[in-house]
Amino acid sequence: MQLLLALLALAYVAPSTEDSGWCYEIQTKDPRSSCLGPEKWPGACKENQQSPINIVTARTKVNPRLTPFILVGYDQKQQWPIKNNQHTVEMTLGGGACIIGGDLPARYEAVQLHLHWSNGNDNGSEHSIDGRHFAMEMHIVHKKLTSSKEDSKDKFAVLAFMIEVGDKVNKGFQPLVEALPSISKPHSTSTVRESSLQDMLPPSTKMYTYFRYNGSLTTPNCDETVIWTVYKQPIKIHKNQFLEFSKNLYYDEDQKLNMKDNVRPLQPLGKRQVFKSHAPGQLLSLPLPTLLVPTLTCLVANFLQ
């Protein structure tokens, strides 16, 4: 009985900040943690078409089919739900926003947005371009509207944007930044004041050039089901906006481990080819009524899920 009580007492005074699930390298260094770092991630994480990668621009090939995207519903203003999912800040998207074109095999509906960051200006992005990392990286995750086992390799289309620190406040990011203090603890939720996805993107003239490759989710189970679009031109946000992420968000309930370095290490490119856009045309960001048919397709697919 005394031994049992001693073990219970030990368990009480030394709680784990994580369950036995996956986590980032910085979390494994916490003596209270028992989670699995990137080297031990399960699922497909050891396969050979993983993400993120370093993009060597001199080795990319132009694909003339990589034209600018048509962004349907990206201009809709909504109050977006957000949460601290214990790994990042995640914004749930909906309402029929989707992307068309860019040599994608179908229409893809926007389902969520999340970010990766550090507290330094050059080590917070997951992808790197010619060996250069950025302060942050934003992923807008889209799901294929019609999907089957036969085409599972293109189940998701992710738009990845590098983010660097500048000297001007990015008004498009400000609604999200203002909401961060309300989701400090893991699993906490809140709502971003009315804004649009378009507000967070670079000007259309900065979205002509992007890179394309087939890869994986960058978190377990690391399924190799992603068509990656990585934009060359970074988004700029003010230093104070950037620092709000690591300042306000925490990995643990006790709020002792600030959320930062939520970045998977680079993965080997292997035999894959990275392509780049020719993109001579204009990016089309259209209001919902302008493209009625694709928009209704997005909405109906969302309703039927």
Curated annotation (Swiss-Prot):
Its EC number is 4.2.1.1. Inhibited by acetazolamide. Disulfide bonds join 23-35, 45-222. InterPro entries: CA4/CA15, CA_dom, CA_dom_sf, Carbonic_anhydrase_a-class, Carbonic_anhydrase_a-class_CS. Zn(2+) binds at residues 114, 116, 139. SUPFAM superfamilies: Carbonic anhydrase. Substrate binds at residues 218-219. Its main location: membrane. It is a lipid-anchor; GPI-anchor. Gene3D superfamilies: Alpha carbonic anhydrase (3.10.200.10). Residues 20-278 form the Alpha-carbonic anhydrase domain. Its cofactor is Zn(2+). PROSITE patterns: ALPHA_CA_1, ALPHA_CA_2. One of its GO terms (cellular component) is transport vesicle membrane. It is an enzyme of class 4 (lyase). It is found in: Cell membrane. Keywords: Cell membrane, Disulfide bond, Glycoprotein, GPI-anchor, Lipoprotein, Lyase, Membrane, Metal-binding, Signal, Zinc. Residues 278-305 form a propeptide. The active site is at 87 (proton donor/acceptor). It catalyses: hydrogencarbonate + H(+) = CO2 + H2O. Glycans are attached at residues 123, 214. Belongs to the alpha-carbonic anhydrase family. Interacts with SLC4A4. PANTHER family: CARBONIC ANHYDRASE, CARBONIC ANHYDRASE 4. This is Carbonic anhydrase 4. It comes from Mus musculus (Mouse).
